[in-house]
Design a protein with these regions (language model features):
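AlphaC helix of the eukaryotic protein kinase fold
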Residues: 40-55
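Conserved HxN/HPN-centered segment at the entrance to the catalytic loop
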Residues: 57-66
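Key residue(s) within conserved catalytic/signature motifs
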Residues: 59, 210, 229-231, 235-236, ...
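Conserved short submotifs of the Hanks-type protein kinase catalytic core
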Residues: 71-85
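Activation segment signature within eukaryotic-like protein kinase domains
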Residues: 102-103
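Protein kinase catalytic-loop region centered on the HRD/HxD motif
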Residues: 108-118
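C-terminal lobe helix-coil module of Hanks-type protein kinase domains
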Residues: 164-269, 322
């Protein structure tokens, strides 16, 4: 892309959603976000980000200016706050002072995002602009941001989950039976900090399913074990951000910012950071009710035991879960999801609806609607095997 109404553009990011910096004689500098020609989902992201323009502040975000088309591509024009994408500054560990000079305003910018009532849902270095001259940090990439305080991510094939898997919180994968909220952004912030401090991501994997497994079940190597000169308290801050459950993480970006400022003060004053209690100023202004299931340990244990028996001995088992509407049957059953999908299993579900009593197979159809996408995005040899088995079962039923 070379010109747009007198602008000359240089590339900052390639991909389905590309980012360009535009400048020209006498023209106001801009950023241009362009969607791929055959990327309907990407177009929707640009439209969504533009719709948020009144809620994004120039103090912490690159604000949308216009939504237009250029050479057959949907483009979003942003104000250019200056700065360099943070992913261009990665690749080697950062010293403590340099890290804190980036991390503190970054946590502060995220604090403003959350105070505005938004969840970014795609925090990563490529969506962060860092101005080395002023120290300012601004976010881009609000294409999947949510105005909801808390929302559920449905289980989807890894290739279609909105966001970036390398930076994605466990609950955002849709496989934890937990909601996405502002603390999901804090996990992604922790991944970004980890990469800044060590020069590497906390998890790498050969395929998306394995990467999801890492986020859900594996503990990363603490940063101070990879960078021996790193003060332990900084490493502990990052590890707290990377906790598997929301309740164990920092609850607010303000709490992270306060602890980082304490680290900077100690580092500049004494050249070291002694251990201190984390999160002393980490108080949320919202009541976040924990999503842990209480009083259902027996029912969950029964389901897990049935699953274990089938895995060990083969065959099939039927477990019926009954109860009044709204009592929590789905929540109990969904606790199996993580256990099944981590070893590359397939989890599908259907729910009986009183309004569909005249459609006896609607629940099975609902379950199979979840099965087909998982097969298409799974191992290629699964498809003919499942097809053959399904044909045999259908033939048996038809003969009855």
């Amino acid at each position: 892309m070379n010109e747009l109404s007198g602008y000359v553009f240089s590339s900052l990011r390639e991909g389905d959603i590309a980012l360009y910096r535009g400048s020209g004689n006498g023209l106001t500098p801009i950023l241009l976000v362009a969607a791929g020609e055959t990327s309907p989902g990407c177009v929707e992201r640009l439209e969504h980000e533009y719709a948020l323009k009144s809620e994004l502040d120039a103090d912490w975000a690159a604000r949308p200016v216009a939504l237009t088309h250029d050479n057959g591509r949907m483009t979003l024009v942003l104000e250019d706050p200056g700065g360099t994408p943070l992913d261009r500054l990665l690749g080697r560990p950062r010293d403590v002072s340099h890290f804190l000079r980036i991390a503190i305003p970054l946590a502060g910018a995220l604090r403003h995002v959350h105070q505005r009532g938004l969840i970014h849902k795609d925090i990563k270095p490529a969506n962060i602009l860092v101005n080395g001259a002023t120290g300012a940090v601004k976010f881009t990439g609000f294409g999947i941001a949510s105005r909801l305080a808390r929302e559920r991510q449905a289980p989807e094939p890894p290739e279609t989950v909105a966001g970036t898997l390398a930076y994605m919180a466990p609950e955002q994968t849709g496989r934890m039976n937990r909601s996405v909220d502002s603390r999901s952004d804090l996990y992604a912030l922790g991944v970004t900090f980890y990469e800044l401090l060590t020069g590497a991501l906390p998890f790498t994997a050969a395929d998306p399913i394995e990467l999801i497994h890492c986020h859900i079940a594996r503990e990363p190597v603490p940063p101070h074990e990879l960078a021996s000169a790193l003060p332990a308290p900084l490493s502990m801050i990052v590890m707290k951000l990377l906790a598997k459950t929301c309740e164990e993480r920092y609850q607010t970006a303000a709490g992270v910012e306060a602890d980082l400022r304490r680290c900077l003060t100690a580092w500049e004053s004494f050249g070291r950071i002694d251990p201190f209690p984390l999160g002393l100023q980490d108080a949320s202004d919202r009541l976040m009710i924990p999503e842990k299931l209480y009083g259902r340990e027996g029912e969950i244990a029964t389901l897990l035991a049935a699953f274990d028996r089938v895995v060990k001995h083969g065959g099939s088992e039927l477990v019926l879960v009954s109860g009044y509407s709204g009592i929590g049957k789905s929540s109990v059953v969904n606790e199996l999801h993580k256990v099944i999908v981590l070893p590359r299993g397939i989890f599908i579900s259907g729910k009986f609806d009183l309004r569909l009593r005249d459609s006896p197979h609607s629940t099975l159809a609902q379950a199979f609607q979840g099965l087909i996408p998982q097969l298409l995005n799974g191992q290629t040899d699964d498809i003919p095997r499942c097809e053959t088995r399904s044909r045999k079962l259908l033939a048996i039923r038809a003969a009855c």
